[in-house]
């Protein structure tokens, strides 16, 4: 007999499965719905010591969590070039390197290895900087607790932080094997597995409240050390992702190719006048037969739930850490925020 969780997963999958064509977009960890969903879960899990405005801002944080992928739009050439490396780190290209807590020192070390930094990526640095950006904004809030502009800024920055943290928790964002096992020249065969994994939070049904129950939320004494530890744990799951690939492809097989358009018929002799032709037979009414989607294997459901919980826990811990560390920030003497109009 199937475990009740497996039954729930299989039954709800028939309702929630999405067309495979939706996966034909550039790689972005967890997709739009997934990034927003896990960011909001992290905010809702925060303890009371985090300010009320922030705990009430889950929706806005989720909306902002999508922004970093918008910044990679192909029409924004300069912004795309700067933003794209912020979303990944191909760890194999820097094996054995001790990562400094400075993106430019890191870039210099990568260049010493005669590797293009754009191929490596700087995901841990985009996340570290996002944490520090939120920390400073929380420090502003401590000084100007009624300033709604600062509160809204904190929610936006929190969304960006959640995006980069979510990318780090997607194992294929940490590896040269990001879309199929890398070819000998380290290029990607682009097999489509990246899109399958990115869609898990969106396409696999699970009980979010149950998955995030008693979510562990830490205060990290050293954010940089914590980021590297989380990066290592995520990277260690790359092989597991590839072990799950057959199950994912069973759940979401490739969409069938559209039927070829028939060639126009060769003109024939003129038809007889309408009044000399017999009336056509009534057209048969086609019967629509819904093809049920294949079930989602329990192995994929379990992996999705584990990743969602780990990601929400990591994001919430970074939020709590940013709040705690903001207490030690001294705002510069030149900073004067205008008071809101009465």
Predicted regions and their residues:
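N-terminal, motif-rich segments that launch catalysis or mediate targeting to/interaction with membranes
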Residues: 26-160, 171-342
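Cleavable N-terminal signal peptides
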Residues: 16-17, 22, 27
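Bacterial N-terminal signal peptides that target proteins for export
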Residues: 1-14
């Amino acid at each position: 007999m199937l475990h009740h969780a497996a039954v729930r997963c299989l039954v709800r999958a028939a309702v929630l499965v999405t067309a495979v064509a939706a996966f034909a977009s550039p790689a972005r960890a967890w997709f739009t719905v997934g990034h927003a969903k896990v960011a909001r879960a992290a905010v809702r899990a925060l303890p009371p010591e985090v300010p009320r405005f922030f705990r009430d801002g889950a929706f806005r944080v989720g909306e902002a969590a999508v922004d970093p992928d918008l910044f990679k739009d192909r029409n924004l050439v300069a912004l795309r070039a700067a933003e794209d490396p912020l979303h990944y780190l191909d760890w194999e290209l820097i094996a054995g390197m001790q990562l400094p807590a400075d993106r430019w020192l890191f870039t210099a070390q990568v260049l010493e290895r005669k590797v293009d930094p754009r191929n490596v990526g700087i995901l841990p640095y985009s996340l570290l900087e996002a944490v520090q950006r939120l920390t400073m904004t929380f420090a502003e809030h401590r000084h100007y607790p009624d300033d709604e502009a600062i509160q809204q800024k904190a929610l936006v920055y929190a969304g960006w932080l959640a995006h980069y943290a979510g990318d780090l928790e997607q194992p294929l964002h940490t590896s040269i094997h990001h879309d199929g096992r890398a070819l000998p020249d380290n290029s990607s065969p682009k097999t489509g597995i990246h899109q399958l994994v990115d869609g898990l939070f969106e396409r696999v049904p699970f009980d979010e409240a149950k998955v995030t129950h008693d979510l562990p939320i830490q205060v990290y004494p050293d954010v940089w050390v914590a980021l590297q530890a989380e990066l290592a744990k995520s990277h260690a799951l790359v092989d597991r992702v590839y072990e799950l690939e057959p199950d994912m492809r069973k759940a979401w097989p490739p969409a069938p190719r559209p039927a070829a358009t028939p060639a126009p018929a060769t003109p024939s002799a003129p038809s007889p006048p309408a009044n000399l032709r017999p009336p056509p037979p009534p057209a048969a009414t086609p019967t629509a037969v819904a093809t049920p989607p294949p079930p989602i294997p329990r192995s994929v459901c379990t992996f999705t739930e584990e990743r969602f919980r780990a990601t929400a826990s990591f994001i919430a811990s970074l939020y709590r850490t940013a709040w705690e560390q903001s207490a030690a920030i001294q705002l510069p003497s030149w900073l004067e925020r205008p008071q809101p109009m009465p």
